Amino acid sequence: MSDCNSGGGERRPNARATDAPPVRAPSGGAFRCRGCGACVILIAKYNPKTDEVTEFNASSCLTLLYSIHFCSIITTEGLGNTKDGFHAIQKRMSGFHASQCGFCTPGMCMSIFSSLVNADKSKKPDPPKGFSKLSVSEAERSFSGNMCRCTGYRPIVDACKSFASDVDLEDLGLNIFWKKGDKHPDPTKLPSYTLGGGICTFPDFLKSEIKSSIDFNDASISSPREGWYCPKNIKQYYKLVNSGLFSESSVKVVVGNTSTGVYKDQDLYDKYIDIAGIPELSAIVRKDKGIEIGAATSISRTIEILNQESESTSSPNGSVVFRKLAEHMSKVASPFVRNTASIGGNIILAHKYPFRSDIATILLGAAATVNLQVSSKTLHVTLEQFLEQPPLGHNTLLLSIFIPHWASDCKKEHTLVFETYRAAPRPLGNAVSYVNSAFLGHVSLDKSSGDNILSNLHLAFGAYGTEHAIRARKVEEYLTGKILSASVVLEAIRLLRETIVPVEGTTHPEYRVSVAVGFLFSFLSPLCKGVIEPGKTLSISEDLVHTDNVHNMPLSSRRETLSGDEYKPVGDPIKKYKVELQASGEAIYVDDIPAPKNCLYGEFIYSTQPLANVKSIKFKPSLASKKILTVVSAKDIPTGGRNIGSTFLFGDEEPLFGDPIAEFAGQALGVVIAETQRYADMAAKQAVVEYTTDGLKAPILTVEQAVQNNSYFQVPPERAPKQVGDFSKGMAEADHKIMSEEVKLASQYYFYMETQTALAIPDEDNTMTVYSSSQFPELAQNVISKCLGIPFNNVRVITRRAGGGFGGKAVRSLHIATAAALCAHTLRRPVRMYLNRNTDMIMVGGRHPMKARYSVGFKSDGKITALHLDLLINAGISADASPVIPGTIISGLKKYNWGALSFDVKLCKTNNTSKSVMRAPGDTQGSFIAEAIIEHVAAILSLDANTVRQKNFHTYDSLVLFYPDSAGESSTYTLHSIFDRLASTSRYLQRVESIKKFNSTNKWRKRGISSVPLIFKVEPRPAPGRVSVLNDGSIVVEVGGVELGQGLWTKVQQMTAFALGQLWPKGCEGLLDRIRVLQSDTLNLIQGGLTAGSTTSESSCAATLQACNMLIERLKPVMERLQLQSDTVSWDTLISQASQENINLSASAYWVPEQDSNFYLNYGAGTSEVEVDLLTGAITIIRSDLIYDCGKSLNPAVDLGQIEGSFIQGIGFFIYEEHQTNSDGLVISNSTWDYKIPSVDTIPKQFNAEVLNTGYHKHRVLSSKASGEPAVVLGASVHCAVREAIRAARIEFAGNNGSGSSLLTFQLDVPAPMTVVKELCGLDIVEKYLEDLSNRGAASGN
């Protein structure tokens, strides 16, 4: 069995599962998606021959348990923990406010630790004390594969950069170690760091065991029934394969097992052959003509070898190939995947599947060959020949890859050129390419003309919609020997278009071909006289670092906050409550709760059809099917219960199971029960559902179909938004009109890091305890009790914390909790359900997609006189919370004074997954629609969009007209001052001019800038609170709200200290440490309500304050009596005396906001500048500036983190995140492979955020304001800036073909990913440019 040092101590796993389960760390790691990095661990391997230890980080969910035999495993708990003390990484992550929900934090810590350990091993000079050898640029890349949905990454970057030897401490963001603005921050105040990480990564006991087992030659490290085989050489491998022990269907050959991150296992395997230990497959052989790399060599190791080879190769011609290959490979996958994925495995995937491999393409461009072992024969074939072969069986091994030097083949008069390209959503990797290519050739000069001639060309293209990478041989043949000119390049591109033909069904086919054309143009243009080279910037904004590539700009930020003193410690930017536990992995989420005895596991079987009768559910014969214990379905609902999976505020319900009709693709049909979660997951994949549509109408999938079928949900009158003014009169006053224009907004998936999960434990007297990752435990209790037919007081729902929510765990979590409870009730055994990422994305829904059609009238100066909006909202199959969405959309729209506003909003019922609330629901879409209209008006009038925006800002009087119940007093209307301040601090006008200059001198890159205002209506909800003082003076606080990462517990802790501090002898010093905030428990504190809308923190604080005030009233008389005896009365003395006097030391309150008077508006604004690559559509966010009115912030550090994270999530919605479904409405962008949230390399290069502390307000909780949701709206500033850049591109390449109006006005829907951006910039701009050059050349006689 494997020995591992997990969590700092010796642990010996005793797994016997025949399917070789992934590593599951005792704590500090989690896995359900195979792509987010939350489960990253450090693996250390010991070589007894060299006495060397190699450390690397890896994704534990991809790492098979038996593959770490004789390895040492370090989780974040092994770095530091409560018992042994926390590591400097954990302390700095905590101190830089770099953890919110905390679910991703263990993986972040381990990625940073791995980078520090490996950097400190380098030959760089020793850094100053307390720092590492890591550089700032390396620090920024150290966690490029780790995803975070909460923070927006900036504080994580700061925490990591704090270790860098070249960091400027003044550039680091808000932290607890020094005050922001200190001219000379003291590095000694940072938690101490020891060079090398300060952790023993490989224990002596394990070294001894390894040394004693060197002569162990058996091919199996475990008993035959465990089925894990490790051949020590190729001969042993073939002996195993030919032994008759294996069948092709049940054996899996593995090296790193990372392929399962892309092509998920469809069944269990009963036998594995691990070939990573075969020396021949990891051998590195340097030859005269090149280098041979063993197929089992990791991609990371391959990069190291290539870099070494590029430095050692004598000829610069030869070194360029290895250097470029290494650079490109560093953008493949993520660091922790590259560490275990083998280069040969990547090529095998490219051979076996239509896998969009970068590595296969670039090696093909470098003319690599491969060595194969077929039984007793060794074959040498070109990579091109290998990729074209039929699939290989286990009797064929890929031995090695040979990459030629090229230097020896290059004549003196020739220059070797080699370039690689990729177009992908993320510049640093962790995203598959839309297109990739690699070009190699020899360049010589024509003696007569001095022009360049190409020879020995290799032009490789891949990922464009082909089975495998290819060489464009017709293009190679055409270009060989020709003098390069614009006309020659143009003809080559025409030939390329004939060659690069995506197969039917390829997404974005025209885009992929266009980008391939752009890559070839980028390669050839520097070799052509008179052709503008895409790769260089000709001028640059004064605001920017001077660089030819904005992708390489260093990340920087300015984070400004003001703290108030009147309510201390409320208002202080203290670190998050118990944040170190999140960093150390000790924070307990639902799946971390130890499985009770006899626990079973469940996974949903879901429909793949949108409207069909379910005739039967059967299972394919397979290993996984044999693991099924039972299937729980609607027939198992007990007498007195009912088929209910969720209920809503407006009386509607959604069934738990589709029975007998599946109403939408993704609807649960039953739950497979097995003894492990992996067994259950795999078994569910074996389900074969038979459907029939007899007697059923066609499904309604689109809003247009809903209109045709009159399929709508009703909006309660009290929730219906109110129109303003007389639309007809306003249109009559207009000088100009835009009639019936359209804009569409797609859905967005929540992508909380912790997927939906619940643990249900049946108890005596027909009771049930359910641990649920939920934003609405109270409603979960309601639905579970109705499903089981038992009273509410028989159901206890507990939520300690959730690993993110964003609205997705409000209503959509109820199905999982209810299903787990039903299974546990039926089987009388505990049942755990933890959805994998694919199932979660398919079943849970997301933000509401919609289509808006608007008509608007306006004056010549940009003043809008009237707006009418027709809005179709796709709500999905059930009402959920959708009836609130029309009101919030219109509320977001009303941020401008439209003069008169009318609308027709239809809430469409369709056969899709139910859409629910998601961060700033409705407001996000409504605000964007407003911006689209403003920008359209500005384009028609050829005015700066900000001029039109400000022209239509509300006066206080119009604000009251549009927001009659929440406008507040005139002194609280701060939008005008915020927008003016933002224009000044962001240098908006100066940058507009700089961008004009940039765009006029750069043909292939364009920039845009835009500002977006924010008005966001907030409606606080009631909340309970209880404060209890124990006899030792310690304090426990209970609130109904759930800690999701938004800092609720932190603010409640601060509020408790502020209130009880009146009786604390030394202000509040030391009081915070005496306060513990407890988990949500529906039988302990009732009426907990919904945690959503960014108001639960303040509502919980209000309830806590009321409860504290009750205690103070009881304790003050005791204090006064004690003060007669002594001037100073300690807290402990006070509590002891009160206890003796039988004073009730527990107080409960239920805070209810006053109707309307507690409603208020949030204000803010954001400015963003972007650069667009016209050849790929890639977007780089150069800079974003935010200013946000937070009232009197309860905790500026928490609020700033919420604002930044919310803004980045907004960027994801508006730009990056493509929510795609098939023709049946089934979600197909259902994994980290297909769905890309923002990552550290796609956030703004410069990110400045300022939190304003504005004045006193009697109706708000200590004058505070919400922070978690509103800033999503400001992400639209990036979308609007992209529109400006596209507009500049369209003007650049218009020629004589387009009118001014068609160039300036165009529909840019949401999201606007690089594929859409490129299409709008032009799919044929390279050809247009070359045609123009060729025509001009012909006219001049050249």
Curated annotation (Swiss-Prot):
Residues 221-408 form the FAD-binding PCMH-type domain. Disulfide bonds: none annotated. One of its GO terms (molecular function) is oxidoreductase activity. SUPFAM superfamilies: 2Fe-2S ferredoxin-like (SSF54292), CO dehydrogenase flavoprotein C-terminal domain-like (SSF55447), CO dehydrogenase ISP C-domain like (SSF47741), CO dehydrogenase molybdoprotein N-domain-like (SSF54665), FAD-binding/transporter-associated domain-like (SSF56176), Molybdenum cofactor-binding domain (SSF56003). It holds the Pfam family MoCoBD_1. Gene3D superfamilies: 3.10.20.30, 3.30.465.10, [2Fe-2S]-binding domain (1.10.150.120), Aldehyde oxidase/xanthine dehydrogenase, a/b hammerhead (3.90.1170.50), Aldehyde oxidase/xanthine dehydrogenase, molybdopterin binding domain (3.30.365.10), CO dehydrogenase flavoprotein, C-terminal domain (3.30.390.50). SMART domains: Ald_Xan_dh_C, CO_deh_flav_C. InterPro entries: 2Fe-2S-bd (IPR002888), 2Fe-2S-bd_dom_sf (IPR036884), 2Fe-2S_ferredoxin-like_sf (IPR036010), Ald_Oxase/Xan_DH_a/b (IPR000674), Ald_Oxase/Xan_DH_a/b_sf (IPR036856), Ald_Oxase/xanthine_DH-like (IPR016208), AldOxase/xan_DH_MoCoBD1 (IPR008274), AldOxase/xan_DH_MoCoBD2 (IPR046867). Residues 1-23 are annotated as: Disordered. Belongs to the xanthine dehydrogenase family. This is Putative aldehyde oxidase-like protein. It comes from Oryza sativa subsp. japonica. The lineage of its organism: Eukaryota, Viridiplantae, Streptophyta, Embryophyta, Tracheophyta.
